[in-house]
Regions:
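Peripheral, non-transmembrane regulatory/ligand-interaction domains of membrane transport proteins
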Residues: 1-214
Length: 216
């Protein structure tokens, strides 16, 4: 594996072919404006330093667009490389003007076969929290944060009156809910597997041995 600290290249290391698409929500306590596009220039004019700006990036294929975004918000080049590294370990990193979080979210594999054990897929999400902005980078087009978009449009619980740290907490709450749901689905699958193993009556069978070890 090459040392990225010595490289000036920007390479997305994941396997998603999703074209890069941007969605910007700019808001304050009284109003909200949205814009979407495939380039940073197409949404840049909507940015407002007097408001909260939440820029959602879906698809990391266009590394030059990712570079433009990070350059505008003065994000360090090494952080930019981390965003594009789909296999980056989970981390929270504090910088002078912003905080970086790299996490994973999980979702069902809709194309798996009945005997396929790989029932869960994952994708990386990177969140950058600044003074008046939040940036979220996802590998694929997804509705994962749609509930938060709807809450902003309808100003649920006066969410638009809050600062960026509150938006971050809402984003993290959605991710934590995803973890809980994922763990629950794994527990259900393990219970189903245990029931199948209990139907085996041969005491010498490997299934019985596994169960005995589980319940020691």
């Amino acid at each position: 594996m090459k040392n990225n600290l010595l490289s000036e290249k920007l390479i997305y290391t994941g396997d998603s072919l999703t074209p890069t698409h941007l969605h910007l929500c700019t808001y304050n306590a009284t109003e909200m404006q949205e814009s979407s596009g495939d380039t940073f220039q197409s949404v840049k004019e909507t940015l407002d330093n007097e408001r909260i700006n939440w820029l959602q990036v879906h698809g990391l294929k266009d590394t030059e667009t990712i570079r433009e975004i990070c350059s505008h918000f003065e994000i360090d080049f090494l952080v930019l490389q981390d965003i594009l590294n789909a296999n980056h370990p989970t981390k929270i990193e504090e910088h002078d003007k912003y905080i970086v979080l790299i996490l994973k979210i999980f979702y069902p594999n809709e194309h798996k076969e009945d005997d396929d054990l790989d029932g869960l897929l994952q994708q990386q999400v990177c969140i950058i929290l600044g003074n008046n902005y939040v940036l979220t980078f996802l590998e694929k087009e997804t509705d994962f944060f749609d509930e938060i978009n709807a809450a902003l449009r309808n100003d649920i619980l006066k969410i638009r009156s809050r600062l960026t740290d509150y938006l971050l907490s809402v984003l993290l709450n959605s991710i934590m809910a995803n973890y809980i749901s994922t763990i629950s689905s794994i527990d259900d699958a393990l219970e189903d597997l245990e029931e199948e193993l209990l139907m085996i009556t041969n005491e010498n069978d490997i299934g019985i041995q596994i169960l005995s070890l589980i319940h020691i």
